[in-house]
Regions:
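Anion-binding alpha/beta catalytic cores of soluble intermediary-metabolism enzymes, centered on
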Residues: 1-60, 66-195
Length: 195
């Protein structure tokens, strides 16, 4: 998300055009490096509810978010939006994107927890190390009872392994690119061949 885990009253002042651009570029680089997606499609969520054409709920989309998306697009980053979070997750639009940039932490985690109740994985982007975690809460009452579901933990381990392999591959390619070979183009038209 654009903001970290901060009090909700501080969210509005933390959302700036520069912050959106910086976080989205970092997110895009992480997707490219750790998931080997060459040109990721990133959805940018709106801050305010839908049907806000008259700015009655706020003008952040018009003044901050849309200009940031336009600047990202001018830099060649596939950023789309802003999308109202309720429609975006409720209608399944999230399946059409490689990543989602939320404006604040709970805007992304609340629908994620609703969609993936048992096997969700937390992936922290932009770190020099790979960090994954099972998106579960400790349930000490079932410790040692052979009742816990380890699926989320297993998915977190597999994601960490895959991301590490992808990052290693990406870094090797970036360090040792193939040299570009330029050949002069020959004119193979009929006129040249029979002259």
């Amino acid at each position: 998300s654009v903001t970290e885990k901060i009090p909700f009253e501080d969210v509005l002042t933390s959302i700036t055009k520069e912050a959106i651009i910086e976080k989205t570029k970092l997110f895009q680089q992480t997707i490219k490096r750790d998931f080997l997606i060459t040109n990721p499609r990133i959805a940018v969520l709106a801050l305010n509810p839908r049907n806000n054409e008259d700015d009655s709920c706020g003008s952040e989309e018009r003044e901050i978010i849309i200009p940031a998306i336009n600047e990202l697009a001018a830099q060649g980053i596939q950023a789309f939006g802003p999308y109202a979070a309720d429609d975006f997750f409720g209608k399944g639009y999230f399946t059409d994107f490689d990543g989602i940039m939320a404006m604040y932490h709970d805007q992304a985690t609340t629908p994620f927890h609703s969609l993936y109740t048992e096997d969700g994985v937390i992936y922290t982007a932009g770190l020099p190390i790979i960090r994954t975690a099972a998106d579960t809460t400790p349930c000490y009452s079932i410790v040692g009872c052979n009742e816990a579901d380890e699926t989320a933990f297993r998915h977190a381990i597999y994601l960490a392994i895959d991301a590490f392999r992808n990052r290693t591959t990406s870094d090797e390619v970036a360090e040792n690119p193939l040299p570009k070979l330029y050949h002069e183009k020959r004119d193979e038209s009929e006129k040249v061949r029979f002259s």
